[in-house]
UniProtKB/Swiss-Prot annotation:
It comes from the Bacteria. Pfam families: Gp_dh_C, Gp_dh_N. It is an enzyme of class 1 (oxidoreductase). It comes from Geobacillus stearothermophilus. This is Glyceraldehyde-3-phosphate dehydrogenase. It catalyses: D-glyceraldehyde 3-phosphate + phosphate + NAD(+) = (2R)-3-phospho-glyceroyl phosphate + NADH + H(+). GO terms for molecular function: glyceraldehyde-3-phosphate dehydrogenase (NAD+) (phosphorylating) activity; NAD binding; NADP binding. NAD(+) binds at R12, I13, D34, R78, S120, N183, N315. The lineage of its organism: Bacteria, Bacillati, Bacillota, Bacilli, Bacillales. Keywords: Cytoplasm, Glycolysis, NAD, Nucleotide-binding, Oxidoreductase.
Length: 335
């Protein structure tokens, strides 16, 4: 029986989680909460500038969405405590507003009747951070109720960092994510607490911070203090790429590094990590459902122990599929 899911925040990630859930028989979205009317939500769900028209019948009945004949309750509550998830049978809430990333705030969904909360972002004081393919085995249904799915960039980096560390040992590394612009930037020059993000997103390459590299330690504790990095926001609407330069414990060749990554992509990390030897560009990865695709043509090694690994990710679609996978995994372990 499908687990019943509510989505709080029907923005870029919320709607992409919904799209991903439509393809997963183990997930049933029964309600969404957003401070917008149902007609607007229906239009934005059906028509997407990045991912195209949704292959589903979408309409509105009163204040609710109707997708492929199934009615989905639409709420418009500012405070999660007032959502009464329990009354409508919601088991798991996907918290994707970006506003309730502290445990005490996200836990209000539990008070409203949900059994588990998945925060679709890095969180503070969460019960556990999980990256699928890396540390989902650490999930304890009795102890973990507010779970972070980390960031899209951590979901890209952690799987191949795991492979590199297990096979060759990572001494230290620096990561740059060349990242498409997001809603946390300004479309034209306007005030922002980060003065670089205050600048027009489509007009510049914008250096900014990311906690993604350090956050790998939350799912791979053995890498604590060994990774750091930054972001370069670029004028594309979707798809990003991680560039990791790391010092390894063992001497390697390009062929050995690629062979290890390819084996993982075809084996234990299939569906999470992919491997490509084609000369592709970012547009080719739009719609990719995996967390990370190794660009094997870009792998480099200097002096045996210094390695560069480049990996692509659809920072919307891939990440949203992992949110859905995590919800299904949590449900499979018992709520």
């Amino acid at each position: 029986m499908a687990v019943k899911v509510g989505i709080n925040g029907f923005g870029r990630i919320g709607r992409n989680v919904f799209r991903a859930a439509l393809k997963n028989p183990d997930i049933e979205v029964v309600a969404v909460n957003d401070l917008t009317d149902a007609n607007t939500l229906a239009h934005l769900l059906k028509y997407d500038s990045v991912h195209g028209r949704l292959d589903a019948e979408v309409s509105v009945n009163g204040n609710n969405l109707v997708v492929n004949g199934k009615e989905i309750i639409v709420k418009a509550e500012r405070d999660p405590e007032n959502l009464a998830w329990g009354e409508i049978g919601v088991d798991i809430v996907v918290e994707s507003t970006g506003r309730f990333t502290k445990r005490e705030d996200a836990a209000k969904h539990l008070e409203a009747g949900a059994k588990k909360v998945i925060i679709s972002a890095p969180a503070k004081n969460e019960d556990i951070t999980i990256v699928m393919g890396v540390n989902q085995d650490k999930y304890d249904p009795k102890a973990h109720h507010v779970i972070s799915n980390a960031s899209c960039t951590t979901n890209c980096l952690a799987p191949f960092a795991k492979v590199l560390h297990e096979q060759f040992g990572i001494v230290r590394g620096m990561m740059t994510t060349v990242h498409s612009y997001t809603n946390d930037q300004r479309i034209l020059d306007l005030p922002h607490k980060d003065l670089r993000r205050a600048r027009a997103a489509a007009e510049s390459i914008i250096p900014t911070t990311t906690g993604a590299a350090k956050a790998v330690a939350l799912v791979l504790p053995e890498l604590k203090g060994k990774l750091n990095g930054m972001a370069m926001r670029v004028p594309t609407p979707n798809v990003s790429v991680v560039d990791l330069v790391a010092e390894l414990e063992k001497e390697v060749t390009v062929e050995e590094v690629n062979a290890a990554l390819k084996a993982a992509a075809e084996g234990e990390l299939k569906g999470i990590l992919a491997y490509s030897e084609e000369p592709l560009v970012s547009r080719d990865y739009n719609g990719s459902t995996v967390s990370s695709t190794i660009d094997a043509l870009s792998t480099m090694v200097i002096d045996g122990k210094m390695v560069k690994v480049v990996s692509w990710y659809d920072n919307e679609t891939g990440y949203s599929h992992r949110v859905v996978d995590l919800a299904a995994y949590i449900a499979s372990k018992g709520l």
